[in-house]
Amino acid sequence: MPQISQRGTNMPQSPIRKLAPLAARAAERGIHIYHLNIGQPDLPTPTIALDAIRNFKRTVLEYTPSQGFLSYRRKLVDFYAHYNIHTTPEDIIITSGGSEAVLFAFMSTLNPGDEILITEPFYANYLAFAISAGAVIKPITTTINEGFCLPKVEEMEKLITPRTRAIMICNPNNPTGYLYTRREMNQIRDLVKKYDLYLFSDEVYRDFIYTGSPYISAMHLEGIEQNVVLIDSVSKRYSECGIRIGALITKNEQVRQTVMKFCQARLSPPLVGQIAAEASLQSGEDYLRDVYDEYVERRKFLIDSINRIPGVYSPIPMGAFYTVVQLPVDDSEKFCAWCLTDFSYENQTIMMAPASGFYMTPGMGHNEVRLAYVLKKDDLAQAVNVLARALEAYPGKTI
């Protein structure tokens, strides 16, 4: 029988989605599941975007330019200017989601065996994209006990080898909700400059910063303009995960030319998705403010509530809509599966993402989960109550 490729064998399962079959069977048994496992916003997509789809008049669903519609890229220039990110339409490449932007960035800049430093815990699909590019992730370990802040620059510098080609950050961070400080961003800049590395910066959650701290984009950092590749997406900002529209932005012409080869090979980004995304830029600040205010309330409610459960601890996330939570359990992956297979409270249970899947270092995150506060407050209240009941009943509890 023909063999599966080594690349395919090495490809990890998603820690966010691999429990889905267990959830499906629980739902078949009539169990109501509170989904805190995945960053799927429940807030309405802008009406203007939905209207653009409803009023779509074309008679042919044609290919779009491989770089994306020029009209959309021009409007993005104005959008980014509000964040003091100064770019041109030529600097922007529209992708099929932020995920494709990361994949194409890796494929365009990393050779097989090259190393990329990424702060852990990190968005699990980064590992899949690195494997696809033949690259090796070297984790910069951060811990829940220190609030997921970066280690000292000397510790980070020890990880750099002759094979190191890039550093990647997600700011604000998925899965931790951590927001890098000016000092930390300068620390990263100095390493990028000293060793002439690429800096990949996933800034999908820039609109969700809750501390009053300034948003510092990688494109704000002086002296590394040719090293920075910025990743963006409409998925979270406008609750448009399903239209699969992202962007790769860089001042580095050689990188853009190489990325465009991959863009041409996949032909074009989604037609209807670009129409909706372009229309969303007209939704105005009121829409983003309402979304922001809702997440502020959910964040406060969830963190206050779960930190009242005995043995449970979550730092206060500064951005995005996730938090990593420490639980009094022997193994969070077993606990998450048990919640779906062997537990229910008043015919309800909870689905979470085991945090071990967001770490590269073995043993890290073994008693942690990632929660996404993407449910209404009433549902969050029920979910927290169910979690507390589950922890009381779980055979592997540690308190």
Each PLM stretch: what is its role?
Residues P2-I4, G8-S14, L19, R25-Y34, ...:
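PLP-dependent class I/II
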Residues T59:
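Basic nucleic-acid-binding alpha-helical/helix-turn surface characteristic of O6-alkylguanine DNA
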Residues Y63-S96:
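Conserved N-terminal alpha-helix of the aminotransferase class I/II PLP-enzyme fold
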